Structure formats: structure tokens, C-alpha cells
Design a protein with these regions (language model features):
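Short loop/turn segments that connect beta-strands within beta-propeller blades
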Residues: 114-119, 157-161, 198-201, 243-247, ...
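Blade-loop segments of beta-propeller domains
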Residues: 117-156, 161-171
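Beta-rich, blade/repeat-based domains predominating
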Residues: 83-95, 129-142, 170-184, 213-228, ...
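Short, low-complexity, Lys/Arg-enriched N-terminal segments of secretory-pathway carbohydrate enzymes
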Residues: 1-32
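Conserved beta-strand positions in repeat-built beta-propeller and related beta-rich domains
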Residues: 99-106, 143-151, 184-190, 231-235, ...
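A short helix->beta-strand "capping" segment at the edge of beta-propeller domains
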Residues: 62-86, 115-123, 265
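Beta-strand-rich domains and repeat architectures in extracellular enzymes and scaffolds
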Residues: 75-112, 124-137, 175-176, 289-294
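Blade-level signature of beta-propeller repeat domains, shared across WD40, Kelch, NHL, RCC1
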Residues: 272-326
Length: 326
């Protein structure tokens, strides 16, 4: 809206006798009508200008930042031991302080049941050497797992990790997997978030994930939390909070201090951040990474200072990955 402008022009008086010479009072137009004729336009002008100022002030208060994705830092609540040989690809929390984890690497891929407090592997199902384990989720009594560079997935019994069956999905590849208790969410390393029928594994819907105008590529491990899908962004220290209904990023979680802390402590063999688990009952959030010796319970804190596009792009956005090792 245009800014207020001060009115500086006024009509010039003509130097003729009718204007310059005062009229006898009895010959002048009624002064009441003259006052009304002057006051009414001024009143209307002031009203319009004043309303414009109020409207401009009100509208101006709603900037891009008010509808921008929130940015969150983290506080470490607790640290737990984690197998430093586990190339974490999928992670989830079950009841009674139990975690399920899918690990990758050729010849080392597995599905495992892990005690949260001790990090001890309580049960383990090794995968055939031809498969590279990827995302994992729990629906009912069954664990669903996808594999890298293939459209093959597996279903396991959650109690003893025995394999039920294989399935074939329609994604380009298998990276991440999560569920809301009804359908599956999947990623294939692109910017696409899939909604998958858990009975026939057909794609029910899909959304391209975007941060403002930018596609968010390399979507990796997933977790469903309070109506949102949270995704690790491969090769970054960021988690994207995604609205699965339209693909919009509604928040960023910045976790770079975890990896930096491990490196400072001498753990130089670690790989990238990967693995999100949510304890819905106790509202606890856990994260870890590939070959990390620790698993963390974290708490989120909104970052109040403004983050511009450049900072988020540098920290969280990556170039598309051409289906290499996730």
C-alpha cells in the first residue's frame, strides 16, 4: 500500500475584484453551508488517511517470518550407549524402553531389538549379503523394512524378529519408512514423500517436499510424530518437520552440536546423523547416527532469532543425490 502523502497544493486565488473585495455580509452565501462544504471533505480525507495508516500498520505486522517454518535448537536430556558398529538406517521406539533398529552395509545389515538403557542388542536378524538394510517401522505386531537400491522389503515378527514375508513397493528406491498406525510413509532419497497402503504396498498419494520455493532432496529416515512426518536430510545435521498433506516444511531442527561433540571427544569414525525415535506415551524424542557410540534423548527449543534462507539452505538443503549410498 502506498505511503501517506502530505497534500501541499491548494487553489490559487484570482486577483479579480469579486474575490479580492469582501462582500457585504448580507450578500455572502450562508456561512453554515460553507463550513460544511469545507469540513466534510477534510473529515473524509482524514478518515481515509487514518484508516490507511491503521491498515498498513496491521498488515505490515504479518511478515514472511510469521508464516515461515520454525527453527529449533536442541537440549540433550540424557545420553545412552549405542553400538558403534551399527550403521543406523531405521530407528523406532516401542514400549518398555525397547528400541528396534535397522542397520545397513553389505554383509552387515540387520534388524535388531535393543534395550534403551544399556544399548544391549537383545535379538538380531541378519540379512542376506545381497541386501542393504534401510528404513524400519512398526505397525501392529509386524516390523516393515525397506532395502537400498531395490524395491524389495521385508516383514518381521516384532517378538522374535522371524521373517514373515517379502513385499515389493512402488518407490524408486527404499530409504525411509514410518507409519501413523494406518498407512506407511516412505522415502526413496528424492524430494518425494510417499503414502503407501500397508496391505498391498501401492502408493496412495505422494507429495514433493518443499521449504518455501526450494525442493528438499535426500529425504532419509522417517518418524511420524503428532500428525507430522519428521525426516533426516541425508548428509546434513538437520531434521525436517513435514506436513504430509501438502509437503510443506513446517519446521527445522538443528542438531549439528551432537556430531561436533562426538568428533571433539575423539570419535572420528562416525558417519552422518540418522535415526529418529519417538516415545508417544512419555513424549520423549531420541536421535542417533550411523556408527555413533551414543543415542540421545533431546528436547527442542524454538530459536527466537531470525534465520534467513541462506542459513537454512547452507545447513539443511542438499543437491539431489543420484541414487548412491544413502
Amino acid at each position: 500500500m502506498a505511503a501517506k502523502q502530505k497534500i501541499t497544493r491548494r487553489p490559487k486565488l484570482k486577483p479579480d475584484s469579486d474575490v479580492a473585495s469582501p462582500m457585504p455580509r448580507s450578500q455572502r452565501p450562508d456561512s453554515r453551508y460553507r463550513r460544511i462544504g469545507f469540513v466534510l471533505p477534510v473529515f473524509l480525507l482524514l478518515f481515509v488517511v487514518g484508516f490507511a495508516g491503521i491498515y498498513s500498520k496491521w498488515w505490515g505486522s504479518f511478515t514472511v517470518d510469521d508464516v515461515s517454518p520454525g527453527v529449533y535448537s536442541i537440549e540433550v536430556v540424557r545420553e545412552f550407549p549405542h553400538d558403534p558398529q551399527a550403521f543406523t538406517q531405521g530407528l523406532l521406539y516401542a514400549e518398555n524402553d525397547t528400541l528396534y533398529e535397522s542397520t545397513g552395509l553389505a554383509g552387515r545389515s540387520s534388524v535388531r531389538k535393543v534395550a534403551l538403557q544399556s544399548g544391549k542388542v537383545e535379538a538380531l536378524q541378519k540379512m542376506d549379503r545381497s541386501y542393504f538394510g534401510e528404513g524400519l517401522t512398526l505397525l501392529g505386531e509386524r516390523l516393515f523394512q525397506v532395502t537400498w537400491l531395490q524395491k524389495t522389503g521385508f516383514i518381521y515378527d516384532r517378538n522374535n524378529l522371524s521373517k514373515f514375508e517379502e513385499f515389493t513397493h512402488e518407490m524408486k528406491d527404499g530409504w525411509g519408512l514410518a507409519t501413523d498406525g494406518k498407512m506407511l510413509f516412505g522415502t526413496d532419497g528424492t524430494s518425494t514423500l510417499y503414502q503407501i497402503n500397508p496391505h498391498n504396498f501401492r502408493v496412495m498419494g505422494k507429495q514433493v517436499v518443499r521449504y518455501r520455493t526450494h525442493e528438499v532432496h535426500n529425504l532419509n529416515e522417517l518418524e511420524y510424530i503428532n500428525g507430522e512426518v519428521w525426516a533426516n536430510i541425508w548428509q546434513s545435521d538437520c531434521i525436517a518437520r513435514i506436513s504430509y498433506k501438502d509437503g510443506k516444511v513446517i519446521g527445522w531442527i538443528l542438531l549439528q552440536k551432537l556430531r561436533e561433540g562426538l568428533i571433539t571427544a575423539g570419535y572420528n569414525g562416525i558417519d552422518v546423523l540418522n535415526g529418529i525415535a519417538w516415545d508417544n506415551k512419555e513424549k520423549r524424542l531420541f536421535v542417533t547416527g550411523k556408527l555413533w557410540p551414543k543415542l540421545y534423548e533431546i528436547r527442542l527449543h524454538p530459536v527466537k532469532r531470525r534465520f534467513d534462507d541462506g542459513v537454512i539452505k547452507r545447513l539443511c538443503l542438499r543437491m539431489p543425490f543420484d541414487f548412491g549410498k544413502p
